[in-house]
Design a protein with these regions (language model features):
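Polybasic low-complexity intrinsically disordered regions
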Residues: 1-152
């Protein structure tokens, strides 16, 4: 993939379709192909379902059903699922994140830099979804500068 990206950048440079003077950066959040219901605690490997069952047993019922747990989880005060405590063992790089529609999913943060004169993408990076724009912006700009320097 990287070789294809470099090949395209070289073709754009050969045809003078890169100005490299003004670059814009944009990011988004995309849902990972990993289910929240598969997350486990980092410290002991306990599943989210097991965690909820333990809370429910302490709170009100010895053998909660799946429907009981879903209702309990939805109504639970102060609920917070942290990347510090939880991960998906099948996709450990996916991070718990709030999506634009307000739902919580495992996700990634794609970020790209575009030559604003020509519209050419000069860098495309994937970051952890729990990193804000200020944490990733400089890295994406540095990669864009490196890519432009390689083809100039």
């Amino acid at each position: 993939r990287r070789m294809m990206f470099e090949w395209v950048l070289k073709r754009l440079a050969e045809h003078e379709l890169l100005s490299g003077k003004t670059v814009g950066v944009d990011s988004s959040t995309i849902e990972a192909n990993a289910a929240m219901r598969s997350i486990v605690r980092k410290d002991n490997g306990e599943s989210y379902q097991e965690f909820l069952t333990g809370l429910a047993q302490v709170s009100w019922v010895d053998t909660p059903t799946a429907a009981d747990l879903a209702t309990f989880d939805r109504k639970r005060e102060g609920k917070k699922t942290s990347n510090d405590d939880w991960h998906n063992p099948h996709d450990p790089e996916a991070k718990i994140a709030k999506m634009k529609d307000g739902t919580t999913h495992l996700a990634y943060k794609p970020e790209h830099a575009v030559d604003l004169v020509t519209g050419a993408v000069v860098s495309a990076e994937i970051h952890p979804a729990d990193q804000g724009d200020t944490a990733t912006l400089l890295g994406t700009l540095a990669k864009a500068a490196e890519n432009l320097a390689e083809v100039s």
